[in-house]
Amino acid sequence: MEREQKKKFYITTPIYYPSDKLHIGHTYCTVATDAMARYKRLQGCDVMFLTGTDEHGQKIEDKAREAGVTPQQFVDNIVTGPKGVLDLWKLMNISNDRFIRTTDDYHVAAIQKIFRKMYDNGDIYKGKYVGKYCKPCESFWTESQLVDGKCPDCGREVQDAEEEAYFFRLSKYADKIQDLLENTDFLQPRSRVNEMVNNFIKPGLEDLCVSRTSFSWGIPVDFDPGHVVYVWVDALFNYTTALGLYNDKYHDYDHYWPADYHFVGKEIVRFHSIIWPAMLMSMGMPLPKHVFGHGWLLLDGGKMSKSKGNVVDPYVLAEKFGVDALRFFLMRTFPFGSDGNFSNELLINTINVDLANDLGNLVSRTTAMVQKYFGGTLPAGCKTCAAPEAYDTELLSLASGLRDRYEADMEACAPHKALEEVFKVIQRANKYIDESMPWALAKDMDANGARLAHVLYNLLEATRICGILLAPFIPDSCTKLFAQIGADEGVQTWDSAKVWGSRPEDAPVVKGENLFPRIDMDKALEELEAIRQASAAPVQPAIETEPWQEDVDFDTFCKSDFRVVKVKACEAVKKSKKLLKFTLDDGSGTDRQILSGIAMYYKPEDLVGKTLVAIVNLPPRKMMGQESQGMLLSAVHKENDEERLNLVMLNDAIPAGAKLC
């Protein structure tokens, strides 16, 4: 079927903030979105599944400074480095069609156009922000919105904030947003609506700060370069720029927008259900059809948080128990719209009970009996039985109606309920084995061979239907399942899941390895605890520092003039592989030029706007035909025999020309 003839379905995760490695909570949302995307592809829809990373902001800038790298280097490591975001989604078998980074050039250019359009239509204006700011959440608050003087979202300390800023006229759209929330199914589950209306809209929506001047790591406002676009515009519009809005990178905005679903954690429902639709209204753009705010995975009763350090590493669990087992656990165990308490014991128990005992045993016992009693191929005529037993009819009826029940739950964004329906059939099939007693029938094949073949066909067919509907959740395991029960691609379809008897009678059955081996609970918990303790005390790399220099007297030291400098421009020096040329503001009113041999450590564009330290009273010297008027300070060491260099970077609030003493 051509793309234009298929029903389109556009679904997104939030774009994650790469201030640290992602944890099991991020994995939960992404697996849920992936399962929904796979389900819609199974139905034959034209699916676009987007995820990505939100890479700008003060927190990233500060963490990069602490690490002695540029913000771009910092986020590159988290996103594309070993066991980074991209590696994690590959490991978890995430089938996203696109991945957006807000540092992508096409997104940057598009955001500048979007910001200007809202400014030109009067919905963005310049003013002064005075209030409170939560750096971990990157959220602004008024005094009245604080809870016990702390951030109402995360409960952490806030800081005073005062700076020139641009504001979005959020208050202008308050009535329209309230109507959207109260009178449509835009925001789900419904319990989120009262929270948004009562806590944010009815107390009075205030205009929203949408630019910052107190840090530089962001998209510059092109008509006022002292400002960078704040997260609300930069991050939220990713859902449209990734389709080609205001850029030539992609060309399917008109095809896929509006989104069918934004899946987001409940802590960012406010941004997606109030701020996001208001900005789209300002732009004259269609609104997404639904925002679904899922619950949190709790650890010891509290929310997991990178900044709190109480997170669970999905890499450890996936590598220990298997990717499909982890995917299944996340979707089977926790109602998607509610919070759930995570524990390793619960994970292992779910794997053992549902996957090893119920599903694994059904596949293993059925395929083993087909091999043992019929050499792997059932005889002709096994689909039908002249005198079916009541339990035959019960299994057939339950399995034949499974697809409709499953579909209703998936459409309601209740994957845990959809899986519950599948496992009702699996459990009924296991009971069917006990009721039909194939081993007893096999004692007299002449009298009971046809009946035995019919029983085993029923088991294979029930397993096939369950496998089709489990595939969005455990795709690799279902591929193995289909191979074992003799179900080729033609009977793995959505349509065939509703048609009992689709599997050919003579399709070969192969007894394969157990899909989900049982896990020794005590042993696994001991191993996980050992891993946790080892990761809590990371091995420090072998570091070598330069040898100490001979002592100098205080007067000699004081002759060196250390000054704070701001990078106005930076470029590579032609015909040099090592040198970068800096144009610096040293507070004197005249630009200072310094050449530094750090090209192998930094990209010049990443250093513009940074606050550095220079010795400014060294005699000028010629380098590659150009004059260098001083030296930038950096730290040099060897780590695992590799030389590392980090420029000394200071807080951007320190003015150019300030003397270090």
Question: Model segments located where?
Answer:
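A glycine-rich helix N-cap at a beta->alpha junction
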Residues: 80-97
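Phosphate-backbone binding interfaces of nucleic-acid-interacting proteins
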Residues: 537-661
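Hydrophobic, well-ordered secondary-structure elements that form the walls
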Residues: 272, 301, 422, 459, ...
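Structured secondary-structure scaffolds
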Residues: 2-51, 106-110, 154, 160-372, ...
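Helix-rich, typically C-terminal accessory recognition domains appended to large enzymatic cores
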Residues: 126, 333, 338, 346-383, ...
